[in-house]
């Protein structure tokens, strides 16, 4: 892994998240070589591999028989990953696991103990958005005074995550909270540098084992021991703010995690300003740029043997909030887990 050697990445999954997001990024990284691509649908994997000019590997009956790689990207649904965790934990292969991760802290921690922290990455790439990192810095510096409260809203009537696995709880792991809303939860945790979290109240509306609406009140405890009140509204049943709002002592900041503009709205009480990002190296505005930055950070940490914000262990508080929200609705454990 040291020196100028290219990192060989194997990929499990050839669906949209891989073919439209990860492959355009990875195939444009000079220090990455795609070692192989496989999928349970061999024809689909072969077609995607041919389109990108990368090696295709037929999916073996036993995942442990997959070819060697320095890193494996698991770009498959939550419920299809269990056998791969077991197969790769003894091979010394680093792992990048697409979001969502887990429904319980226990299972999350169990995976973390099987890998070195720098060798196990999560897919919450919106941490790498320029606007998220800017707000994290503003909070740390106290530019607008202490952070008093935060809110994340996402969704509208009829807004349902795409994908053939979404209607199968054992494969998707959950509904709109778990599949998409978790991005906003993770962003709040990351920006506030939360070291603990407690869900004070949560209401979840379900249908056929899938959550369609969640509203919750959360207490985030920062590394400095400061409690920050946060609220969530994640829904495909009603309109939400579709943004993150951070309330400081002297200002309010608002932005969207999903519009790819990188814009930040500042309300100082006397004036409202729309702050457009200047063109700056390393400021990820689009989702593709954020994913590129996320991969760069992970692979850089892998080369150096040093964990960073891409480490799966760094997302444990996010999983704690997810677990508590589902527990409030009487749902416990990991759906379909062995």
Which stretches of residues belong to each language-model region?
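C-terminal helix-rich "cap/oligomerization" subdomain common to oxidoreductases
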Residues: 1-3, 71-73, 221-223, 297-338
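N-terminal Rossmann-like dinucleotide-binding module
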Residues: 1-53
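Short, conserved SAM-binding/catalytic segment
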Residues: 47-55, 110-115
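Short acidic low-complexity segments
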Residues: 55-68
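A contiguous active-site-proximal alpha/beta segment in oxidoreductase catalytic domains
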Residues: 63, 102-159
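Beta-strand-loop-alpha-helix segment that lines the small-molecule cofactor/substrate pocket
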Residues: 70-78, 82-127
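Rossmann-like dinucleotide-binding domain that binds NAD(P)(H)
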Residues: 162-229, 233-239, 313-316
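NAD(P)-dinucleotide binding in Rossmann-like oxidoreductases
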Residues: 208-211, 224-293, 311
């Amino acid at each position: 892994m040291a020196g100028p050697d290219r990192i060989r990445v194997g990929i499990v999954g050839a669906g949209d998240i891989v073919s439209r997001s990860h492959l355009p990024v990875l195939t444009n990284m000079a220090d990455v070589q795609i070692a192989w691509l496989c999928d349970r649908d061999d024809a689909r994997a072969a077609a995607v591999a041919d389109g990108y000019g990368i090696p295709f590997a037929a999916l073996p009956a036993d995942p442990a028989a997959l070819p060697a790689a320095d890193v494996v990207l698991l770009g498959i649904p939550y419920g299809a990953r269990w056998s791969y965790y077991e197969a790769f934990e003894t091979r010394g292969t680093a792992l990048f696991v697409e979001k969502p991760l887990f429904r319980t802290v226990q299972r999350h921690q169990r995976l973390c103990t099987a890998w070195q922290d720098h060798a196990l990455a999560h897919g919450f790439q919106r941490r790498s958005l320029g606007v998220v990192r800017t707000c994290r810095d503003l909070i740390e510096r106290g530019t607008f005074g202490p952070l008093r409260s935060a809110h994340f809203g996402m969704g509208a009537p009829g807004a349902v995550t795409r994908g053939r696995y979404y209607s199968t709880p054992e494969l998707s792991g959950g509904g709109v909270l778990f599949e998409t809303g978790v991005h906003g939860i993770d962003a709040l945790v990351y920006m506030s540098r939360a070291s603990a979290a407690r869900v004070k109240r949560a209401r979840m509306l379900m249908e056929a084992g899938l959550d369609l609406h969640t509203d919750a009140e959360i207490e985030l405890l920062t590394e400095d021991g400061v409690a920050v009140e946060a609220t969530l509204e994640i829904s495909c049943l009603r309109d939400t703010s579709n943004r993150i709002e951070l309330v400081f002592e002297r200002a309010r900041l608002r932005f969207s995690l999903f519009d790819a503009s990188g814009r930040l709205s500042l309300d100082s009480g006397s004036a409202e300003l729309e702050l457009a990002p200047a063109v700056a190296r390393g400021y990820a505005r689009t989702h593709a740029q954020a994913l590129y930055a996320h991969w760069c950070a992970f692979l850089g940490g892998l080369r150096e043997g040093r964990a960073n914000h891409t480490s799966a262990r760094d997302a444990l508080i996010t999983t704690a909030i997810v677990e508590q929200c589902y527990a409030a609705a009487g749902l416990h454990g990991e759906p379909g887990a062995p």
